[in-house]
From Swiss-Prot:
Its main location: cytoplasm. It comes from Vibrio vulnificus (strain CMCP6). GO terms for molecular function: folic acid binding. InterPro entries: GcvT/YgfZ_C, tRNA-modifying_YgfZ, YgfZ/GcvT, YgfZ/GcvT_CS, YgfZ_barrel. This is tRNA-modifying protein YgfZ.
């Protein structure tokens, strides 16, 4: 259901402060839900995170791999309604749903794509707004009259609401402008939040998108699909890649399509990969998340593919890549 409120395009300058409060329509993300008597044990055997220990007021990162340890998806997992919900990139959901259902015939589970509306409340005033909306911002997962609120990071909350209650919720947040998903994407980029869009499925192991650094891998739980590769990456050091944020210049006339980079190798240049998510500022700059070799020299240079004059550089990570 389309909101009756106008949706603003979120265009910021690279030096501009983020809005103190805004709501993003997250139509580029989706939810897979799982219910049924076997939901906990079934999901526990499929994903990297510890489902069994997840409390009803908690949210955790997780990943779902194929048998070789390559990711079908990364997600934020939380209790929702009578089961679980997995928030992830919408473009990856069709394939992820198929793979997640592969063994469901042997268990008492129902796995579906939710038709709920996803809203992102963000900014330094987000927690105050959520407290007013739900009368409770103490827990990371809060059920309220119109839906469920999930704390994503200190300045971000996800709202999962029924389509017929979307306008009511937005009216309760009327002091915040309604923006497109670009602002939420920018927060993901600044926080270097793992993401797997459709084009990156089956390309990377969990550690290559820093899932271990955001507590999205349990090395103490029982077996799950792809576990051998994930464990080998930790204990034998076979992982050679990591997720980084890069920023640089871009031609003002460049269409906002996927950004691809090249990196310097001696006197030559080599393809460095495609942004998993990117954001274009309004002053000729852009930023995005890229999976790169984790042993690159500090002096490695980057440039836009096909635009050799547009130089990019790595930004500091907001967290350690250690999984301890």
């Amino acid at each position: 259901m389309q909101s009756t409120q106008p949706i603003q395009r979120c265009v910021l300058g690279s030096q501009q402060a983020l809005p103190e409060l805004a709501v993003s329509l997250l139509d580029n993300l989706g939810l897979i839900t799982m219910t049924g008597n076997d939901k906990k044990s079934y999901l526990q055997g499929q994903v990297t995170c510890d489902v069994v220990s997840l409390e009803t007021d908690q949210v955790t990162w997780g990943g779902h791999c194929d048998a070789k340890g390559k990711l079908w998806s990364v997600f934020r997992l939380f209790h929702y309604a009578d089961g679980y919900a997995m928030l992830q990139d919408k473009s990856a959901i069709d394939v992820e749903l198929r793979e997640l259902k592969k063994y469901a015939v042997f268990a008492k589970v129902e796995i579906n794509v939710s038709d709920a509306i996803l809203l992102g409340v963000c900014g330094v005033q987000a927690e105050q707004a959520i407290a007013k909306l739900t009368n409770n911002a103490e827990a990371a997962v809060v059920t309220f009259a119109q839906g469920t609120a999930v704390k994503i990071s200190p300045q971000r909350w996800l709202l999962v609401v029924d389509a017929n209650q979307q306008d009511e919720v937005l009216a309760m947040l009327a002091t915040a402008p309604l923006c497109d998903h670009a602002l939420w994407d920018l927060y993901d980029i600044l926080e270097v939040a793992p993401r797997i869009p459709a084009f990156a499925q089956n390309e990377h192991i969990p550690q290559a998108v820093n899932l271990q650094a955001v507590n999205g891998i349990s090395f103490k739980k029982g077996c799950y699909t792809g576990q051998e590769t994930v464990a080998r990456a930790k204990y034998r050091g076979i992982n050679k890649r990591a997720l980084y944020r890069l920023s640089g210049t871009i031609a003002p006339s460049a269409p906002e399509t996927t950004i691809s980079l090249e990196r310097s190798v001696g006197d030559n240049w080599r393809a460095a990969g495609e942004a998993l998510v990117s954001y274009h500022f309004d002053d000729g700059r852009a930023t995005g998340l890229f999976v790169l070799p984790n042993d690159l020299e500090p002096e490695t240079q980057f440039r836009l593919a096909g635009q050799s004059e547009q130089l990019w550089q790595r930004e500091p990570l907001p967290y350690s890549l250690d999984d301890e």
